[in-house]
């Protein structure tokens, strides 16, 4: 079933071998609510707790590919959610710091990771809009929810050469990649339209 999912992703244009291998290795059904387990290897998003979703595998693969993650990359993830994206990053060999703003999801992820082989360097309950300055700079930052604007703290926390992958927009989002080219300059690229749940700010 995972192999079939990988074949689907390849047909949709995912080419990074490490990303495809991670998707092929990770048991996605473990990250899903029991009512949807039969559909774990379908390329679709499904509901999880707190009105959030586990992202479509294509979206996870595309964001990871755009991040250009390699073994040892220091990555900040904004929105732990189900933990599936976290696991993909970890499987590739990234050092992952992950922030979750929904307390219910944070506790669920915290308990889940204790039982699995996937262990983020740090799992933080907090506001993703402000990033994680104490651990900056990062090789990459990935935002797993739709942001109405690009939070400046996230750009500031990138290393030179680092990438911010963020879906920007209200109803639908444009996948946007900012690459830091100097202390003050960034290169911006866009990669088509996606749909994400909103990135929430400062509420518990």
Where are these regions (language model features)?
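Conserved nucleotide-cofactor-binding alpha/beta core module
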Residues: 68-187
């Amino acid at each position: 079933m995972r192999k079939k999912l990988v074949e689907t992703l390849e047909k949709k244009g995912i080419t990074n071998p490490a990303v495809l291998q991670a998707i092929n290795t990770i048991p996605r059904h473990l990250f899903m609510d029991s009512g949807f387990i039969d559909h774990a290897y379908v390329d679709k998003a499904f509901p999880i707790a707190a009105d959030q979703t586990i992202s479509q595998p294509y979206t996870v693969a595309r964001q990871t590919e755009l991040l250009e993650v390699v073994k040892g990359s220091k990555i900040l993830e904004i929105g732990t959610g189900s933990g599936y994206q976290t696991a993909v990053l970890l499987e590739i060999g990234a050092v992952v710091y992950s922030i979750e703003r929904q307390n219910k999801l944070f506790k669920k992820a915290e308990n889940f990771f204790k039982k699995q082989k996937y262990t983020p360097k740090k799992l933080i309950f907090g506001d993703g809009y402000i990033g994680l300055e104490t651990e900056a700079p990062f090789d990459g930052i990935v935002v797993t929810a739709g942001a109405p604007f690009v939070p400046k703290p996230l750009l500031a926390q990138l290393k030179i050469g680092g990438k911010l992958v963020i879906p920007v927009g209200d109803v639908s989002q444009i996948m946007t990649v900012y690459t830091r080219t100097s202390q003050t300059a960034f290169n911006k690229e866009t990669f088509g339209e996606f749909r994400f749940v909103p990135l929430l700010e400062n509420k518990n």
